[in-house]
UniProtKB/Swiss-Prot annotation:
GO biological process assignments: photorespiration; reductive pentose-phosphate cycle
Active site residues per record: K175 (proton acceptor), H294 (proton acceptor)
Gene3D superfamilies: Ribulose bisphosphate carboxylase, large subunit, C-terminal domain, RuBisCO large subunit, N-terminal domain
Main function: RuBisCO catalyzes two reactions: the carboxylation of D-ribulose 1,5-bisphosphate, the primary event in carbon dioxide fixation, as well as the oxidative fragmentation of the pentose substrate in the photorespiration process. Both reactions occur simultaneously and in competition at the same active site.
Note accompanying the cofactor annotation: Binds 1 Mg(2+) ion per subunit.
Protein name from the UniProt record: Ribulose bisphosphate carboxylase large chain
Reported cofactor(s): Mg(2+)
Sites of N-acetylproline modification: P3
Species whose genome carries this gene: Coleochaete orbicularis (Charophycean green alga)
Keyword Nuclease: no
N6-carboxylysine PTM positions: K201
Keywords assigned by UniProt, alphabetized: Acetylation, Calvin cycle, Carbon dioxide fixation, Chloroplast, Lyase, Magnesium, Metal-binding, Methylation, Monooxygenase, Oxidoreductase, Photorespiration, Photosynthesis, Plastid
Length: 475
């Protein structure tokens, strides 16, 4: 045998393949305050012990590979390796387990959600020993979260900028989402803002298409904002989507929005990417722009119960990367969202400190320290009859966004906006008077209809509209 390949006594290296669990399954490990903790829902292939599967997840998402390598001896694996420190069976499921993995902080670059995700979920989800794998939650320690700027401004600063307090904010996505000219688009924005909404919004797939180039849209929308502000005396905004094919083009659009003097822009953070999103967030803080975030493509990643990444993880990632608003589902509308699960990640977006609560899908206590909060945006298939439930579920620190529920009003856009504003004001007043929105919501709306013909017409149109389908992603 060549002396270059011979295994010598005492060197600690022996070529070959060994079980992951011999190195990466450490049930005796006590987690550190600085560890990043992950909860994976894993479904091993038949015949693969859960300890081996959990150890494989820890190994392949940190320092491990499929065989022993001699360069392991050139570093301290014990310092850098991920550790599967606990495994528990999932109640009611055969061959499904929650594996808890601890990662040392030194594995991750500061201020980089991109690097965090590349490490933890970048490779291991295709591992053959696993039939399915889902990242259910992450615990981000303050030692790591404090390296991030977080949201450009946060909830309180946004309220101060808008001078609006004590109620949810009202929005509307302009429809049809594609096909309008820039001038007609601006007209719809003006009518909605003039009717009483706080915000209007570009749809997530409105970028710069042949029927409406971005610069034309920005100019006509800015005119609509300033005209509606002058007539109502309220600060108004429109989420101008800066998402583009390159980061450089995205920044050019953001800069033009700032030059126009508008208050808020928008980004599709999953399709645009975390690196672009963090750059845009930093620009928004430096230049006084609010940043609305759309989660386009999220259901591809988070909707299946057994495989992918839960949205609570994507929400935490967004809070670190930066955004002042993010779409969160509605509970009552057309899009997926179980109530307790939705409220769990809404709290993770807004609050400073969130206790572990498995009944809401929260696997770890999360301390954001001083990082600003993010406003959840309820949007998708909602209308005036939903207003009491939305006000009760989401509270004041939220944006309630009605697209078809505004523009579908039989009398037009402005009356649709009036109907939503009246319904919201009625619900907030009733709540402040001590009435139960959950039980008396319909009565509150009917009473408001008596002095608002716009609301009465909206109630008549949507009185039978419901989206009653079973939620796929349950606890």
């Amino acid at each position: 045998m060549s002396p270059l390949t011979e295994t010598k006594a005492g060197t600690g290296f022996k070529a070959g393949v060994k079980d992951y669990r011999l190195t990466y399954y450490t049930p005796e490990y006590e987690t550190k305050d600085t560890d990043i903790l992950a909860a994976f829902r894993m479904t091993p292939q038949p015949g693969v012990p859960p300890e081996e599967a959990g150890a494989a997840v820890a190994a392949e998402s940190s320092t491990g590979t499929w065989t022993t390598v001699w360069t392991d001896g050139l570093t301290s694996l014990d310092r850098y390796k991920g550790r599967c420190y606990d495994i528990e069976p999932v109640a009611g499921e055969d061959n499904q387990y929650i594996a808890y993995v601890a990662y040392p902080l030194d594995l991750f670059e500061e201020v980089s959600v991109t690097n965090l995700f590349t490490s933890i979920v970048g490779n291991v989800f295709g591992f053959k020993a696993l039939r399915a794998l889902r990242l259910e939650d992450l615990r981000i320690p303050p030692a790591y979260s404090k390296t991030f700027q977080g949201p450009p401004h946060g909830i309180q600063v946004e309220r101060d900028k808008l001078n609006k307090y004590g109620r949810p904010l009202l929005g509307c996505t302009i429809k049809p989402k594609l096909g309008l000219s820039a001038k007609n688009y601006g007209r719809a924005v003006y009518e909605c803002l003039r009717g009483g909404l706080d915000f209007t919004k570009d749809d997530e797939n409105v970028n710069s298409q042949p029927f409406m180039r971005w610069r034309d849209r920005f100019l006509f929308v800015a005119e609509a904002i300033f005209k509606s502000q002058a007539e109502t005396g309220e600060i108004k905004g429109h989420y101008l989507n800066a998402t583009a094919g390159t980061s450089e083009e995205m920044m050019k659009r953001a800069q033009f929005a700032r030059e126009l003097g508008v208050p808020i822009i928008m980004h599709d953070y999953l399709t645009g990417g975390f690196t672009s999103n963090t750059s845009l967030s930093h620009y928004c803080r430096d230049n006084g722009l609010l940043l609305h975030i759309h989660r386009a493509m999220h259901a591809v990643i988070d909707r299946q119960k057994n495989h992918g990444i839960h949205f609570r993880v994507l929400a935490k990632a967004l809070r670190m990367s930066g955004g002042d608003h993010i779409h969160s589902g509605t509970v009552v509308g057309k899009l997926e969202g179980e109530r307790e699960v939705t409220l769990g990640f809404v709290d993770l977006l807004r609050d400073d400190y969130i206790e572990k609560d498995r009944s809401r899908g929260i696997y770890f206590t999360q301390d954001w320290v001083s990082m600003p909060g993010v406003l959840p945006v309820a949007s998708g298939g909602i209308h005036v009859w939903h207003m009491p439930a939305l006000t009760e579920i989401f509270g004041d620190d939220s944006v309630l966004q009605f697209g078809g529920g505004t523009l579908g009003h039989p009398w037009g856009n402005a009356p649709g906006a009036v109907a939503n504003r009246v319904a919201l004001e009625a619900c907030v007043q009733a709540r402040n008077e001590g009435r139960d929105l959950a039980r008396q919501g319909n009565d509150i709306i009917r009473e408001a209809c008596k002095w608002s013909p716009e609301l009465a017409a909206a109630c008549e149109v949507w009185k039978e509209i419901k989206f009653e389908f079973e939620t796929i992603d349950t606890l």
